[in-house]
């Protein structure tokens, strides 16, 4: 139960002062990441809702040019895949739910944006380990690669998933679903290029300041020290 958990934590803190500090740091870090995730989710919502160029398509549907994915990928680079993915999922799903044109696509949006964040985070933090080096060229290269990986997934997955989603879940005719998928592919490709450029510029610009402010912790290993 929660009460027993709190008692256990207090016992650990009393008997092991060092663990108390680590426990508090971990809790503070989690709270900070959740707050930053909420901020990025808000940016996803605002950028998609108010900065998009909506393109009407047959059947009363629409696709759009937007930079909402920028903050999903940025979150994955700054906070990790799960946090970035959740920021994109929450922010852009709410945006879909608030728009009558996109409301039926909200479940698809939630899943795809979460996957964008997870893929970006996997490449950036599990493969490249960008938080274990201060090498600016290395970080720039892998932030670019990670952004491309996450957004390239979306370029491929969005029209394919959208095609089957609209045809089999929403019951749209195959011809209409096919046209929508082709239009979506073109718009998603343009969005991916713009978002990649923005993410790499923003991330590499703010990273040094965030490190100094202890909002990003870099654990430089001997192998990665420069």
Regions found by a protein language model. Give the residues of each.
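Short, small-residue-biased leader/transition segments that mark boundaries at the very start
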Residues: 1-8
């Amino acid at each position: 139960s929660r009460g027993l958990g709190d008692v256990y934590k207090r016992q650990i803190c009393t008997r092991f002062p060092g663990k108390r500090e680590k426990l508090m740091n971990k809790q503070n870090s989690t709270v900070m990441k959740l707050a930053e995730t909420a901020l990025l989710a808000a940016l996803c919502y605002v950028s998609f809702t108010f900065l998009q160029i909506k393109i009407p398509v047959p059947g009363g549907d629409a696709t759009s040019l937007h930079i909402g994915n920028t903050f999903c990928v940025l979150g994955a680079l700054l906070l990790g895949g799960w946090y970035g993915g959740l920021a994109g999922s929450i922010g852009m799903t709410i945006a879909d739910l608030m728009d009558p044109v996109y409301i039926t696509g909200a479940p698809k949006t939630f899943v795809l944006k979460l996957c964008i964040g997870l893929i970006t985070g996997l490449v950036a933090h599990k493969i490249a380990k960008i938080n274990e080096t201060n090498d600016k060229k290395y970080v720039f290269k892998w932030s670019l690669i990670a952004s491309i990986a996450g957004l390239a997934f979306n370029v491929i997955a969005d029209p394919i998933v959208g095609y089957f989603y609209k045809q089999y879940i929403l019951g749209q005719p195959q011809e209409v679903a096919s046209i929508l998928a082709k239009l979506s592919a073109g718009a998603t490709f343009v969005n991916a290029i713009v978002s990649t450029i923005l993410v790499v510029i923003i991330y590499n610009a703010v990273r040094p300041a965030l490190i100094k402010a202890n909002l990003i912790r870099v654990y430089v290993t001997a192998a990665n020290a420069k």
